Amino acid sequence: TAEYANTDATYKGAVAGAPASSLGKIILEVAPAALSSIEAQEIQYNIPLAARTSVDSYATLLAYAALTGVGIKAYEPRFSYQDIFQSRAKSLAEFAEGSTGDNGLCLDNDSDPSLSLINKFKDDIIQFMTANLDKKVMDYPGLDTSVFATNETVKNFLISSQPGTKRIDKPVYVIQGTADTNVPYPITQALVANLKTLGSPNITLDPVIGASHTQAIVCRNAEAVDFIQTYMSAGTGIVLTDAQKDASTNENCTGIAPT
């Protein structure tokens, strides 16, 4: 949004938590090596499939791809997003669209996990790996990477939707976990570097060491609030205490449930 707001005097700035970018590069280049490395450690420590970061992350990427495909179809009705998936995963991808185009599943559903698009893929990955004990997570027949990499409609979408290609003259605070497997840190690092190269004067990247996707955002809640109060205040006069802003002891930051 910030890229389109350079001429909008009412737009004051933006906070971005692990901004989605370079989906093609993540899926085709970064994820296979990263998830294979994580999986090797999980196997070494006998982590069950349902608790593996590698499984959850690959399911998340497949859900992203499905929602991306449905989004493309919304403006290009002739596009068949099912084609970017292998036969086993085609019906799962269709949950992103739903039966009417308006009742598709969201990435997550806290009240009913069975209605989570991520869980649809995750459950099937687990089923596949349970039935094929010699297979690794990247062996799951999910995305058809050759079609994804060469389909002209997909390629055009990834180029046109890529953020960080225009100078931004408003302050931007970017929070990024260095252990994020959904949006890897090097991807966001390159995004921020490019924005600075384009002459964006106030872009701050805050790497949260060892933090995952959502974890990083929770851990930097106080910093995000301070940034918003500094640059994007609504002028309500409400002032939060440090204790109210700080979420560093929250279990979603520490990873430790309260006892």
Predicted regions and their residues:
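Short glycine-enriched nucleophile-adjacent loop
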Residues: 1-6
